[in-house]
Amino acid sequence: MKKYVFICLTVCLALGVTKAKADTSSTVAVGDSMMVLSDIISKGLPVLYIQTVDSEEPTCDYVSAPAGCMGKSITNATKVPGRMIIYQHIGEIDSVLYDSGDYEKDVSGMTIKIRGNTSAYGTKKPYKIKLQKKQDLLFRGDEATYKDKDWLLLKYDYLLTLVGFKVNALLDLPWTPKFHFVSVVLNGNYKGLYMLCESVKRNPDCRINVDKNSGYIFECDPYWWNEDVYVNSLTAPSYNFTFKYPESDEILPEQLQYMQTVVTDYENSLNGPNYTDKIDVVTFAAWCLGHDIEGTQDSGGANRYYCKYDSTGTSKIQMPLLWDFDMAEHTSFSWSRSHIKHFQSLFDNENRTFVDEYVGLWRKMNKTFFSTISQFLNSFNSSSEGRALNASLVLDGLVSGYTPTDLEEHVQDRIIWYKSRYRWLNRQIDAMNPIGDINIDGAVNVSDIADLIDVLLGSARAYRYANDVDGDGVIGIQDVADLIDLLLN
């Protein structure tokens, strides 16, 4: 997909999206040095050149959590208007992919502000960009589907997000955000490497699809104390729930009351056998497995986004995507902290539907997972986008305070880590629900043969991944024979 997006940028140019050769002769401050803009563009990545009105810089105030809460965040983030041009070097020409025009509210231009919580405390800030006119800034060739006003600039993170979204896609979660590596120049100062990314929001065409009038996107949020509107968590008051849709200044009192009931019923259900009435088990299992694959060592910051399509009784709570990989690859030989802190009640529940789905998702992908990730990373490294990113690392190091290494080293670091993680995870999940453990008692023995026959006769519940001994997707008499062979051998 990354290669596809990068090629689309080139195709857009070939189809005449750009205008005449751009004037890129202006100078840009890169750390303590000065460079010509065209030299930055020549590295190959798109360059977001942002000039705000009167060269005003986005600012924010920093706040710490009140007593009894956790984390630190920002407030009073200024929304600064300006103009944004996206340049890219194609062939021998510096060309314009996009020009927002000068700022005119609801007509042209854009605004930029600092975003994030602890991520906003570093020298390199993450930003939110809001266009005054919708545009697909990734140029995927279908403007009607992908255009939007809201975009993010996430800090370069050594390919953690690249792999994280690949895992998201492999798990077939409802939405995988798309992004592109870019260089950013703000008011004549080179800010370094970023990921220009879709934001988490309602957009039924290309992001999260919930009903416009009765749908919800919400987050179990450790930074709830920095929001004006939230609903309470009864089981974990340090993690109340805040809203992405409707936005906090648009949500009505009756909607807030409804969502308090939804959240309370959801939390209460997790300790009993009827949780399947409240949650979409497939997406919950995929989300948890995703962070277990990633080895995420952050139970607070790894954003737990939820959505509910509408307010009908048949609409279950989903977990639509993985997000925030700052603490990925931090634990090679233990479960992710989210697994332990937020999902343990589902793993321990007498209703084994969640465990069955979790194990099944892994068994569907485990044989090819490591080779898929390795091939994906190596392909990215050799792609035109990978080469452009590699060429830009030296400049990023000048402003981000690190000694740049070759992209190949970043790629191999990821591959080595996932090889180790894969081995540990595979052993742990196999032990959790062994193939052939028909009665889910943690052991495979002769009683499982009788239980599997009961499953075939319809007198026992089919835990489909444990029961499907031969892995052909069908629970049948052949599985009985294979189970006998398994026990004999």
Where are these regions (language model features)?
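Bacterial N-terminal signal peptides
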Residues: 7-16
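Regulatory N- and C-terminal appendages and interdomain linkers associated
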Residues: 12, 23-107, 385-434
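Middle-to-C-terminal accessory/interaction subdomains
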Residues: 45, 56-58, 122, 242-434
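Internal "kinase-insert"/substrate-recognition segments embedded within catalytic cores
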Residues: 130-136, 144-158, 172-177, 189-289, ...
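Conserved oxyanion/phosphate-binding beta-strand-loop segments in alpha/beta enzyme cores
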Residues: 82-155
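Cellulosome-associated attachment modules in secreted, modular CAZymes
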Residues: 430-489
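Positively charged n-region of N-terminal signal peptides that target proteins for export
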Residues: 1-4
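Short, well-structured beta-strand/strand-turn elements
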Residues: 171-183, 296
